[in-house]
């Protein structure tokens, strides 16, 4: 188990850095809710530069939750609005375009996470159809879904009936799509049966009291690492579903208060918008980075910097790890 004293922090002044993308250049990219919304670029020395939408206003901001990086320095933003969702592209010059705002003729609810499917398109998660989304913080709600957005063709719902769909990730083998269902406390997987096509849901494991699975990453051995909000936990999940707590920073009384509300189906924003801990600020995501992919970077909901620590194993490199981001670096004055 990681000692809290061994945690380092990088960056400062970030605004809701929920999701971290680590690039082989050493750059970290995180969502940023300042102004009209966009991302912040965090350099290896810790300095950060905001890259915000120039064609949106603070009255109509983008609120990125999950983000993905495209070749050429475009950043895809899963928009977590109060009522509306969608997927947007933020270009290096700060202009934006709508990638998707409806599926099957229906407007997208607030969206959670986006990731490449490995070549043919993107997967986008929607946690719940309920508005406000806090109505989905219940163990008996399963109206979340996953959209597949092909680079060529029409988007469609690839999986439905999920209990607060959060981060999804392709297994290193490419044969399975794993997904965290936060408020039914479950890590599930779907067999990839074709381009963007998924089989039936299978349960990898269920989590116990105090664990609310949010972030998801794989190491080179194919072991899953799950990040839990509220309890500030990182959980190692073996292939057989066996769980090991690797990191934890939580006040037992606070966790008991949240757990009681969850069990009574009375959980709401106050249970997520406050945290009682020593160092971590409601961690929500884990990204492997560093030159050897053995540094874990933790996204969070309530902090203004990124926590990091050394992992015992290297992470599986994601598709964005080596993409060309030269135009973005040049636009922000970071090109060497």
Stretches with model-predicted labels:
Residues 38-40, 86-88, 144-147, 186-188, ...:
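A short loop-to-beta-strand structural motif that recurs across blades of beta-propeller domains
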């Amino acid at each position: 188990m990681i000692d809290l004293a061994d945690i380092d922090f990088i960056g400062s002044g970030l605004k809701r850095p929920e999701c971290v993308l680590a690039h082989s250049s050493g750059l970290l990219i995180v969502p940023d809710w300042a102004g009209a919304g966009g991302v912040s670029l965090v350099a290896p020395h810790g300095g950060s530069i905001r890259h915000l939408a120039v064609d949106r206003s603070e009255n109509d901001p983008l609120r990125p939750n999950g983000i993905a990086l495209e070749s050429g320095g475009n950043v895809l933003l899963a928009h977590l609005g109060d009522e509306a969702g969608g997927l947007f592209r933020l270009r290096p010059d700060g202009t934006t375009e709508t990638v998707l705002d409806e599926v099957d003729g229906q407007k997208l609810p607030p969206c959670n996470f986006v990731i490449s499917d490995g070549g043919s398109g993107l997967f986008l998660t929607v946690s719940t159809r309920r508005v406000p989304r806090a109505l989905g913080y219940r163990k008996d709600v399963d109206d979340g879904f996953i959209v597949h957005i092909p680079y060529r063709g029409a988007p469609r719902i690839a999986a439905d009936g999920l209990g607060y769909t959060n981060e999804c990730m392709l297994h290193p083998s490419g044969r399975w799509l794993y997904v965290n269902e936060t408020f039914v406390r479950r890590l599930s997987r779907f067999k990839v049966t074709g381009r963007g096509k998924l089989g039936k849901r299978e349960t990898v494991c269920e989590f116990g009291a105090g664990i609310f699975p949010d972030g998801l990453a794989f190491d080179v051995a194919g072991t899953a690492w799950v990040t839990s909000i509220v309890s500030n936990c990182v959980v190692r999940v073996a292939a057989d579903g066996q769980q090991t707590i690797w990191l934890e920073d939580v006040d037992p009384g606070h966790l008991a208060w949240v757990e009681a509300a969850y069990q009574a189906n009375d959980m709401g924003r106050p249970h997520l918008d406050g945290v009682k801990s020593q160092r971590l600020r409601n961690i929500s995501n884990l990204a492997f980075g560093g030159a050897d992919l053995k540094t874990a970077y933790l996204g969070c909901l309530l902090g203004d910097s990124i926590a990091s620590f050394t992992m015992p194993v290297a992470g599986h490199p994601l598709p964005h790890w080596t993409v060309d981001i030269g135009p973005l670096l040049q636009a922000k004055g970071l090109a060497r």
